[in-house]
A protein has these predicted regions:
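Formylglycine-dependent sulfatase
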Residues: 1-123
Length: 123
């Protein structure tokens, strides 16, 4: 993959942190009086934070399907945690790859089906 790094050197880094069952109020960035999160605080200070997030489904997989595709859950046809992402769906990692990014997934996404990485180069 080294040949791609030269092209990507001028691209800004994009880091998306999506935690499961973690409210922002439990981090120093959002003012918790006791919990200390210095690494997250530094990332927030040097990057972008979002004050008005929206969770499109109370279930893990439908919410992730929507997040990965930018579509409503009803458009992804993901109603439960066993729904695979349709092979024909374009995800934002696929789009980033077309712009020269290397994409890595760290953690779980519960994406089942024939394309479990759904655009990520590696996990």
């Amino acid at each position: 993959m080294r040949e791609r790094y030269d092209m990507a050197d001028n691209l800004p880094n994009i880091l998306v942190i999506m935690s499961d069952e973690h409210g922002p109020m439990f981090s120093g960035t959002y003012g918790h009086p006791i919990v200390e999160t210095p690494s997250m605080d530094r990332l927030a200070d040097e990057g972008t934070t979002f004050e008005n997030g929206y969770c499109n489904s109370p279930l893990c997989t439908p919410s992730r399907l929507s997040f990965m595709t930018g579509k409503y859950v009803s458009h992804c046809q993901g109603w439960d945690n066993s729904t695979p992402l349709d092979v024909g769906r374009i995800t934002w990692p696929w789009l980033l790859k077309t712009k020269g990014y290397d994409t890595v997934l760290n953690g779980k996404m519960h994406m089942m089906g024939p394309r479990p990485l759904n655009g990520f180069d590696m996990q």
